[in-house]
Amino acid sequence: MTPPTRQPPIINAPWPVAGFALVLVVAHLLISLLPTRLQNAVFYFGALFPERFWSSSEAPSLAGLPPYSNAFEAFLPMVASAFIHADWMHVILNAAFLVALAKPLLELMRTIWPGREPGASVLLLALFLFAQVASSLTFLALSFPDGGPAVGASGGISGLLAAVLLIREGPGRWLLSQRFLVASSLFVIANAVFAFIGPSLLGANIAWQAHLGGYVGGALSMRMVLWRMQLRRA
């Protein structure tokens, strides 16, 4: 009698990576099930609104949106926007890229912090969130004073991409290595192309500013991780 074959997991990734990807999908599902009024509230408080960020009571936005009332309300969308997506294609693409990029990163971080789970997972999450905040700040800065709103985890995922590309250079190489600069240039060119063709091809604007900011944030934070790896091996 042949033993039963084990079915492969739906998401072939370590559970922290699979769990984070599922959080993105479940968050979108829950938001989509809310009444329209509550969906609008989630978008209002969780999306990045350059108009709200840059306006004030003395200089109101052109659209009439009120400015953020305090620092926490202004900072919240820099993280919360990662868990809000425009549609199902948006969230599924981001979840797929998250799994593809976070899996090798988590494996590397487990070699830096062996036997100290959830330390490696927390480090990976911190890298993602740092890149997401960097992407949000870049988007707000380059959308001054009244750009359109932005949502999605692509800024943090761009940071994971930079981290993966930097891994290929090894812990002893820096951000100005030739291969990393070439890969980064291709990333910038790809975003420039999608910024022009995105509205006609995808029916939506591409937040290229967020992608570039997240990429730089991910590269800088990953450089710190690789520096820590060098110290452990010394």
Locations of regions flagged by a protein language model:
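A detector for small-residue-rich transmembrane helices and their helix-helix packing motifs
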Residues: 1-234
